[in-house]
Design a protein with these regions (language model features):
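Active-site and donor-binding regions of nucleotide-sugar-utilizing enzymes
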Residues: 2-189
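Acidic/histidine-rich catalytic neighborhood
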Residues: 192
Length: 203
């Protein structure tokens, strides 16, 4: 089960375990970015909001983990994403208790997303994309794609083509934002009345 791209020392994190203490005092935003390329799409989120929130980053590859730790150090908490199995996901969520979850690009974990919906945890799909090849596969399972994506409070596509493909598979409203590696239009701000109500705002 442990692949070469994974960390053989920290592999227990893939089963929901952690050796860390949960930081106190600030609410936690969980950003999932599977690879280095996807992680770079979350750069501006980390740089703009680490002062006001605890930022938990999950990745699935050691290369992405090394990039996150090297470039951001104490600004973030890094963990490997748990495998998409209910028991391990619940263990992870019970410990970290995120107020907002941000999924970057295309690495959607169906079981995890359903667990977030059950817990009423706000989830956003940013820099969303779906390749023509994946789109052709999902067309045969569009009802399941609708079931997964109805969890998302908002979906922002990285291109007009991605927007059209995703719109045809989901009942959600999909907005075009552009590639987050090239833009910083998106702002995430706490509601003025309560820090637990997080608004998504487009500049």
């Amino acid at each position: 089960m442990i692949q070469k791209k994974e960390d053989t020392i920290r592999y227990k994190e893939r089963f929901g375990f952690t050796n860390l203490q949960k930081p106190l005092g600030k609410e936690l935003i969980w950003i999932h970015a599977s690879s280095v390329g996807e992680f770079k799409s979350s750069d501006f989120l980390i740089n703009n909001f680490f002062n006001n929130y605890n930022i938990l980053i999950t990745t699935t590859t050691k290369t992405a983990a090394d990039y996150a730790i090297t470039n951001y150090g104490d600004k973030i908490i890094h963990q490997y994403a748990p495998y998409d199995v209910t028991f391990w996901i619940n263990k992870f969520l019970d410990f970290w208790q995120p107020k907002l979850v941000i999924w970057i690009e295309s690495d959607l974990w169906p079981n995890t997303i359903v667990r977030l919906r059950e817990r009423k945890i706000t989830s956003v799909f940013l820099n969303a994309r779906i390749s023509p090849k994946s789109f052709n596969k999902w067309k045969y399972f569009s009802s399941y794609y609708k079931f997964i994506t109805k969890t998302f409070f908002a979906i922002y596509a990285q291109s007009q083509n991605d927007l059209k493909r995703i719109e045809s598979l989901t009942n959600n409203e999909v907005k075009y934002l552009g590639n987050l590696k090239l833009t910083n239009k998106l702002r995430i701000l706490p509601n003025s009345s309560t820090s637990t109500n997080i608004n998504i705002m487009i500049a």
